[in-house]
Curated annotation (Swiss-Prot):
It comes from Ignicoccus hospitalis (strain KIN4/I / DSM 18386 / JCM 14125). FAD binds at E31, Y42, V82, D274. Belongs to the ferredoxin--NADP reductase type 2 family. This is Ferredoxin--NADP reductase. Binds 1 FAD per subunit. Its EC number is 1.18.1.2. Its cofactor is FAD.
Length: 305
């Protein structure tokens, strides 16, 4: 049995595990994909809200966290998805999709909020030139790209594609973007065309490939937007939370409720990062990870909850 089980190898989970190691506690991190998977998915994304990394790319933060993991000798089991959890006396047991079981004195849940990408729910979304994540913006240079979405990632995606040489149009259902003003201003400077108050109606396809997006305007009428690539960036479905709920932790919607020490209502169970109601930022996730790790250490050593 491990001292601590940490589910999720993102900023919160890795920081929690590293903190535990600092205090002589042996954690095991269980990750459904790979270390820092979400951040690596947007490796090109500019970082403007993490001290010391302002203006750098997300990949540099991802690498820094991986270096921290190796420096402290944090053990991570990758490609291991937790599907069930239960308590046996004072220990917590996790069961995975592969049939393995892990036992720990405490559990820190740091699984983030990103599951599968949300879809538009219209035909031809499975065409090979319809994308949900852009890993290499330079591959789109010289092509016509339509981006659907209005949040941080949609705006940043449209911007970096335009800066990489693509002709970009962004479609948003509202009249204002949800991204920070600084990001919007950068998108404008990059020359991204905007189609606001408009909703995707149909993806036109020919020979199996998407060739245009038909959008309906709220004030009436439709527009056909020719394209070489379509990027859908409207958020993600939440991850599987049934195993979390089975532990009896209090939740609000898709988020786990915690106190200022990252404790849930269930003794021995903590949560940190985007899965909590805190702002969804790497900086906040790392800070919460430290608090969760330190509080878990104190609980393991003293038994005081």
């Amino acid at each position: 049995m491990r001292d601590a089980l940490v589910v999720g190898a993102g900023p919160a989970g890795l920081t929690a595990a590293a903190t535990l190691k600092q205090y002589g506690v042996e954690p095991l991190v269980i990750e459904a994909e790979r270390v820092m998977a979400t951040v690596y998915s947007y490796a090109w994304k500019p970082v403007e809200n993490y001290p010391g990394f302002d203006g750098k790319r997300a990949i540099e933060i991802a690498r820094a966290f991986e270096e921290m993991q190796k420096f402290f000798g944090v053990e991570v089991v990758e490609k291991e998805r937790v599907v069930k959890a239960w308590k046996e006396g004072d220990k917590i047991v996790l069961g995975t999709q592969s049939g393995n079981e892990y036992e720990g004195k405490v559990l820190i849940i740091a699984i983030g909020i990103l599951g599968k990408p949300r879809r538009l729910g219209i035909p031809n979304e499975d065409a090979p030139n319809v994308h949900y994540i852009v890993k290499d913006p330079t591959a789109f240079a010289g092509s016509k790209v339509v981006v659907v979405g209005g949040g941080d990632t949609a705006v940043d995606t449209a911007t970096v594609l335009a800066e990489s040489g693509a002709q970009v149009t962004i479609v948003h259902r509202r009249d204002q973007f949800r991204a920070p003003m600084r990001s919007i201003e950068r998108m404008v400077r990059a020359g991204v065309k905007m189609v606001l108050n408009s909703v995707p109606k149909e993806i036109i396809a020919k020979d199996g490939k998407a060739t245009a997006l038909v959008v309906t305007h709220k004030e009436g009428g439709e527009t056909v937007l020719p394209l070489d690539h379509l990027v859908i960036s409207i958020g993600f479905e939440p991850p599987d939370l049934e195993w979390v709920k089975s532990l009896g932790v209090n939740m609000r919607g898709k988020e786990i409720l915690v106190d200022d020490k990252m404790r849930t209502n269930v003794k021995g169970v903590f949560a940190a990062g985007d899965i909590t109601p805190a702002p969804k930022r790497i900086l906040v996730a790392a800070a919460q990870g430290y608090i969760a790790g330190f509080t878990a250490f104190r609980y393991i050593r003293t038994g005081v909850w």
